[in-house]
Amino acid sequence: MSAKPTLSKPIGSGEASSPAVVFRRLWPYIKPLIWVLIGAIVAMAVSAATDAAIPALLKPLLDKGFGAHANDRAKWFVPAAVIGLALIRSLSQYASGYLLAYVTNKILLDLRLKMFDRMIHTSVAFFQRETASTVINAIVFEVNQILNVLLSVLVTLVRDSLTVVFLLGYLFYLNWRLTLIVAVLLPAIGWLVGKINRRLRRLNREHQLLTNELSYIVEESVGGYKVVKVHNGEQYEMDRFESMSKRLRGYAMRMTVSGGLAQPLTQFLASIALAVVITIAVVQSSSDQTTVGGFVAFVTSMLLIISPLKHLMDVNQPLQRGMTACEMIFGLIDEPSEPEGGGKPLERAHGAVEFRDVSFVYSGNATHNRHTLDQISFRVAPGEMIALAGPSGSGKTTLVNLLPRFFDPTGGQILVDGVAIPEYDLHALRSQIAMVSQDVVLFNDTVANNVAYGQTADAGKVKAALRAANLWDTVEAMPKGIETLVGDNGMMLSGGQRQRLAIARAIYKDAPILILDEATSALDSESERHVQAALETLMKGRTTLVIAHRLSTIERADRILVMEAGRIVESGSHRELLAQDGLYAHLHRIQFQQSAA
């Protein structure tokens, strides 16, 4: 299986991902919330301080609350202090939890909006490179990994780190010699965690790539369910899904093995230190260098420090998952936006279009020196209908895709009203173009909003557009008329109705330049006659480029350009091209022979 391009790439324009890089990229989102975050950290610090205060209360209780020299004040002060500490701890934990949730959910919202904004404004090349499942994973699911990191990991790193610091400080206060023995473990633990981190990060990145592949398999199976069923491909798809799922399971287990090593090894090292401390403490007690209360407080503090250390070890695996998610999130945010153009306004174009020595090559073909379009030149007068004909793969669709700047030519110029299109504001240019593709796209919205997509829906204009597209009778019979939902990609409509709704959208836009890519290919003969008449009325006074594989639909074009292998090989009217007896005449004969058969 060839590797598919994905959004998973080093963030920060090629910088290796690390906590410092992630923090630097997240800082613009954190900065406006810094005081809320500081409040959460203060609350966590208070909570961590209460952990260190508990063993500190044991020493006076054991030394002065028991035996013949017991102090009545110590007997009652310590229980009251425990209750007070518990209350402070509860309030501080609630405050830190709420404040952190506020910060993380605001950052989640900002990241998600930024990602969707960049996705919707990126170039067409991005959508050809990335699968839909990869983009959905990044915007919907991967950004939640950041939420998990910001919530659980941040809480653990801050609160448990502060707990360790407070407890270590108290241990040094009690007995600095014994504490140094504990401190010797920290470099060993740090080396161990660093070793595991590198392996976990690599495994997480590979796991994410496989997750995208699995999502893509599901996406293909759902989108192509008819093909799967009619070709009895259920077992094939099941085998593909099972194979990829097993690979994912293998990576998950490898991650579990690597991530799970840190905790038991850390606990083993801590147990060795505890055994040494107990031995030395017993020796010190025999020479009155420590008290029972001091020894119990020291051991209790040591035992209490194990739990936050364990949490700090456990945070490693979700932290690495979050780092991998950051690579994907900022990989999308760093995608270049479409060029906005030169900013020249264009209220309403006259409709003059010129292709001047235009060449184009897709990036994948550049190394093979294969031009999709090669030195294309022609002019279209305002209101003229130009038809593009030719065998499949000759470059017709690529040519019309250059006009709204879905791609920019690699050579030559395209002009509208005598001005090179890069000089126009991109949105102003596209507002002059209506397009009906053979791949109809409808949104899960009302009929009216689909017809008026990108504009405010005017009921009168919507109905007029539907009438012109021969769809009004169908819509009028629907329960809610133009307010009826059409379903996912128009699933509530037939193929011909979906095509006519797309045509109604182009009619509603009322742009001076029309691009019709096999616009009537999905219509029955009766509907095609009505729609063809509506399109002919619509095309009057408008520049029109028509792509049709059925030559009968473009016979009345002012001029027909015949393309082959990215070049214009013939040009003329229908009758002129038939008289030339070239490629167009050959294609015409083949189609009419098939129709007769």
Swiss-Prot record:
Matches recorded under SMART domains = AAA
Record GO terms (molecular function) = ABC-type oligopeptide transporter activity; ATP binding; ATP hydrolysis activity; ATPase-coupled lipid transmembrane transporter activity
GO CC terms, sorted? plasma membrane
The UniProt record lists the EC number as 7.5.2.6
* Quaternary organization: Homodimer.
What's written under domain? In MsbA the ATP-binding domain (NBD) and the transmembrane domain (TMD) are fused.
Specify the protein name: ATP-dependent lipid A-core flippase
What CDD domains does the record tag this protein with? ABC_6TM_MsbA_like
What is the annotated localization of this protein? Answer: Cell inner membrane
ABC transmembrane type-1 domain residues: 38-321
UniProt keyword list: ATP-binding, Cell inner membrane, Cell membrane, Lipid transport, Membrane, Nucleotide-binding, Translocase, Transmembrane, Transmembrane helix, Transport
* TM segment ranges: 26-46, 76-96, 138-158, 164-184, 263-283, 292-312
Which species does this protein come from? Paraburkholderia xenovorans (strain LB400)
Q: Which residues bind ATP?
A: 390-397
Which Pfam families does the protein's record reference? ABC_membrane (PF00664), ABC_tran (PF00005)
Cite the ABC transporter domain residue spans from the record.
353-590
